Amino acid sequence: RAILRLQQQKYKDAEADFDHAIHLSTRNAGVYINRALARYHQKNLRGAMSDYDIALEIDPNNFIGHYNRGLLRAQVGDDNRAIEDFDFVINMEPDNMMAIFNRGLLRDQTGDYKGAIKDYSTVINEYPNFVIGYQYRAQARKKVGDIKGADADEFKVLKAQLDKQNGVSQNNQTADNSESGNRTRKK
């Protein structure tokens, strides 16, 4: 019932149900994680953080708890500890592109531009049409003095925007024919 109330956005009722579940079983990390979500949606960030901490004391390998706590830590400005949570998630799930992208944003914010570029590049390699990844990578590349790389990323963004305006689907684009670019005209 608590999960249903959470899905119905009845957060106060969901929290009460999770309180009852915790009273019955204090060692269930999932209940604390779900109550943290209910508390978060009621703007009780301290309560949500406390629940994530308790959940991770119970189950230190719970990557959902680490991911959600990382998001919350980022929201409250605890960037370095948020990065630690995302590092944990990425170690558990190396293909978790959302965790990698979020870590990239945080690395960018904390001045680790090379780390941010690496994370953005990982996501872009997996999702080549992820335009916002190119935007953020271009900004980070400018910060490390890679103007050529930044220009290439900005060109990708501009091309994607023009293609969207002209109704060109990114999935139907054909690769540039590099052979035709090397041809010379006969005079």
Task: List PLM regions with ranges.
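Alpha-helical tetratricopeptide repeat
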Residues: A2-K187
